[in-house]
C-alpha cells in the first residue's frame, strides 16, 4: 500500500495545528526531528513555559517494524509474523490557567503486511477534553463540534464514538472518567479505505474548532493558588491514565518508540494527596458531581 497520501495529510495537519497554537499563545513551538533506529522517525513540536500553554506537544510519527510487540499480537493474533507501519498525529495541551481545560487529540493509521497476502489496515483516533472547573457551554460546544464533524458519515457515528470515548478514557482503579470525553474510535476499516480516511481527516481537522474557542473564552479568567492546587491534583489522574491504561503509550514504549515524544503528554506540575475529598458545595465538588458523569452533551 502506498502511504504517501496519508503522510502528507498527517504532516500537513501537524503544521496547521501548530501554526494556530503559536498564534494563540504568542510563543513559538520547538521543532525536534528524530530517527528511530529500528525504522521510521518523526517530528515532535513542543512548547514549555509559553505565555498561555504551560506545556504542550504536537507529534507526528511514522514508525515501521519487522514484527509487532506483545501488546499488539495479544489482542490480534492474525498480525503475528507481519511487518508493519504506524503513522499519525498525537497532541496534548496543558494550559496554565485552571479554568482552561486540558485537551488531547490523536489520528492514526496502521498497516501490517505479509508477502502474498492482503494488507491488514485500520484507522483510529479521536479527541477529548479534561476540564478542572467545568463550564457546561464549553463542553456542549466541544461535543457539538465533534458531532458536526462526524455527521456526514451517518447519524449513528457520533453517539457510537462518544460512548466509546466515555468507556476508553475511564480510570478503572478510580472508577471515574478522565474528563468530559469527546469521540474515540479504533480498528476502523469498514466501508472501505477512502471512507475511513475521510472520517479520520474530519476528526483531525475539527480539533482546533472544538478547542480554541473554549480557550479564548476562559483565558483571561482570574485564578489563585486554590485553583492551581486543584488543577495539579486533577492532573494526577491524567498521568495515571496515560501510564496505566493508555494503549498508545504502552504500544509506543513496548515497540521501542521515542520516550521523550511518548511522554510529552504528561503535565509539568502534578500533585497527589492521600484520600482527598472536595468540600461539599464547592466548584471542585461540582466537577465530580456534574461533569465527571457521562451524559449526552450534544
From Swiss-Prot:
Cofactor(s) the protein needs: a divalent metal cation
Location(s) in or outside the cell: Cytoplasm
Pathway assigned in UniProt: Porphyrin-containing compound metabolism; protoporphyrin-IX biosynthesis; protoporphyrinogen-IX from coproporphyrinogen-III (O2 route): step 1/1
Function description: Involved in the heme biosynthesis. Catalyzes the aerobic oxidative decarboxylation of propionate groups of rings A and B of coproporphyrinogen-III to yield the vinyl groups in protoporphyrinogen-IX.
Gene3D superfamilies in UniProt: Coproporphyrinogen III oxidase, aerobic
Reactions mediated catalytically: coproporphyrinogen III + O2 + 2 H(+) = protoporphyrinogen IX + 2 CO2 + 2 H2O
Active site: 104 (proton donor)
Organism: Dechloromonas aromatica (strain RCB)
Keyword entries, A-Z: Cytoplasm, Heme biosynthesis, Metal-binding, Oxidoreductase, Porphyrin biosynthesis
GO terms for cellular component: cytoplasm
EC number of this enzyme: 1.3.3.3
GO terms for MF: coproporphyrinogen oxidase activity; metal ion binding; protein homodimerization activity
Assembly description: Homodimer.
Cross-referenced InterPro entries: Coprogen_oxidase_aer (IPR001260), Coprogen_oxidase_aer_sf (IPR036406), Coprogen_oxidase_CS (IPR018375)
One GO biological process term: protoporphyrinogen IX biosynthetic process
Protein known as: Oxygen-dependent coproporphyrinogen-III oxidase
Top EC category: oxidoreductase
Superkingdom of origin: Bacteria
